[in-house]
Regions:
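Polybasic/polar functional segments that serve as interface/processing modules
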Residues: 1-119
Length: 119
C-alpha cells in the first residue's frame, strides 16, 4: 500500500477539516472544494483544527482507502491555510516528514542533479 505512494501525487487540504467526515464526505470535499478527482491515484491528506489527527483518502482499483492517524502527544507540522489555493501538492518525502512530526519547511538535502552528458 505505501509502496504505491511513489506513483501517486499527494495533496494537503489546507485549513482544518472536520474529521468526523468519512469516505463519502471527504471525497465530496475533494471534488467540490479541492476541485480534484477523488477517483484518481492521488492521495488527499486532511488534518483537524488541533493538528493532532490526520486522515488520508485515496482510491485503489475497486474502492477507497481511508487511513487515520492520531497523535497521543504533539502536533503535525501542518502548513497555515491561505485564501488560495485550497490545496498544496507536496512530495512523498514531505508526506513522510509530516507523518514523522516534522514541518514541511525542512532544510533539504542536496537537490538531485540530472545531467545528460558526462565530462
Amino acid at each position: 500500500m505505501w509502496g504505491e505512494l511513489e506513483a501517486a501525487k499527494v495533496y494537503l487540504a489546507l485549513g482544518p477539516t472536520d474529521l468526523r467526515r468519512s469516505i463519502n464526505g471527504l471525497s465530496l470535499l475533494v471534488s467540490e472544494v479541492l476541485e480534484a478527482d477523488p477517483f484518481s491515484e492521488s492521495w488527499f491528506v486532511f488534518c483537524n483544527r488541533k493538528r493532532d489527527k490526520l486522515k488520508i483518502l485515496h482510491w485503489q482499483g475497486a474502492g477507497f482507502w481511508l487511513h487515520y492517524r492520531r497523535l497521543e502527544r504533539g502536533r503535525f507540522g501542518w502548513p497555515q491555510a491561505s485564501e488560495q489555493p485550497a490545496s498544496l501538492e507536496i512530495t512523498h518525502r514531505e508526506l513522510r516528514w509530516l507523518l514523522d512530526g516534522l514541518a514541511l519547511e525542512q532544510p533539504r538535502a542536496h537537490r538531485p542533479l540530472r545531467y545528460r552528458l558526462a565530462g
